[in-house]
């Protein structure tokens, strides 16, 4: 009899296995509903009943990861991998946890191992690309994003992800082209519209940028980044009052939006509202540098 079942003397081994299985299944539905604390409670009982089930450890680790409980997640993924050393899912999830903790070399080791087991796993490839970008290995990250697109050219998200990397590399036309591909796959993809609008702004194509950002905000009125970008575009087009409305709303939605404070401060300075400008620049410095 397993140690877990010994802890539940009122249950036969068959009953304990059955209860543990149902708890795992219910936990998966809780996870799908983003009810991660409820999932963790079920999985903790399931593990107590059947500690040798790798899936239960992995699922609980994933819930801990989503809740940013990184140390607990690592402990669970380690246990899952003791039981199933070649679980690409557990390796990929542990890699994501390491990446969130800025332990990027360990993350890369897990992603590389996972991809030897599941070479075409899009989410693991995506996580590896993100880690490479965080390591400032941008050309390698770009290769991974291109590989993802080759595997499935119909996924809007994959085009957006590569577009974001191009934008980070200041390759704005390439970014615009990728966001356009994303929008061909999914015409109302809010992030693609918002990010293409930002790339167009950086390319000084303000009217086109305004159209994209306004469409993004029709679809998602609370998109603080689209509001910030549109505010900057409106200012470039000479409409500072409307620009300030967008930036006010962006900061209301995200009081820690450093870039929006900087842009609003510059507009206020242009309008000779210097006390307000000083306040915004001071807030930007406080948020970014702790002044």
Residue ranges and their predicted role:
Residues 1-291:
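Alpha-helical tetratricopeptide repeat
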């Amino acid at each position: 009899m397993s140690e877990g079942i010994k802890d539940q003397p009122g249950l036969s081994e068959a009953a304990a296995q059955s209860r543990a299985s149902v708890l795992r299944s219910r936990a998966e539905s809780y996870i799908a509903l983003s009810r991660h604390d409820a999932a963790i409670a079920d999985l903790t009982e399931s593990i107590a009943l059947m500690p040798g089930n790798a899936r239960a450890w992995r699922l609980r680790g994933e819930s801990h990861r989503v809740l940013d409980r990184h140390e607990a997640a690592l402990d669970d993924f380690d246990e899952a991998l003791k039981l199933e050393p070649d679980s690409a899912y557990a390796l990929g999830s542990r890699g994501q946890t390491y990446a969130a903790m800025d332990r990027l070399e360990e993350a890369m080791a897990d992603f590389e191992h996972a991809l030897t087991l599941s070479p075409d796993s899009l989410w693991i490839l995506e996580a590896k690309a993100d880690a490479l970008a965080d390591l400032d290995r941008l050309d390698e990250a770009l290769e991974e994003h291109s590989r993802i697109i080759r595997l499935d050219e119909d996924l809007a998200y994959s085009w957006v992800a590569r577009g974001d990397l191009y934008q980070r590399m200041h390759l704005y036309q390439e970014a615009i082209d990728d966001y356009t591909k994303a929008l061909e796959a999914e015409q109302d993809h809010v992030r693609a519209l918002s990010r293409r609008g930002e790339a167009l702004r950086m390319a000084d194509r303000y009217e086109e940028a305004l159209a994209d950002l306004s469409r993004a905000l029709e679809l998602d009125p609370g998109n603080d980044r689209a509001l910030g970008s549109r505010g900057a575009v409106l200012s470039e087009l000479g409409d500072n009052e409307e620009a300030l409305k967008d930036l006010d709303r962006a900061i209301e939605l995200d009081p820690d939006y450093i870039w929006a404070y900087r842009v609003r401060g510059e507009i206020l300075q242009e309008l000779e509202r210097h006390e307000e400008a000083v306040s915004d620049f001071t807030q930007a410095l406080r948020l970014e540098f702790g002044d």
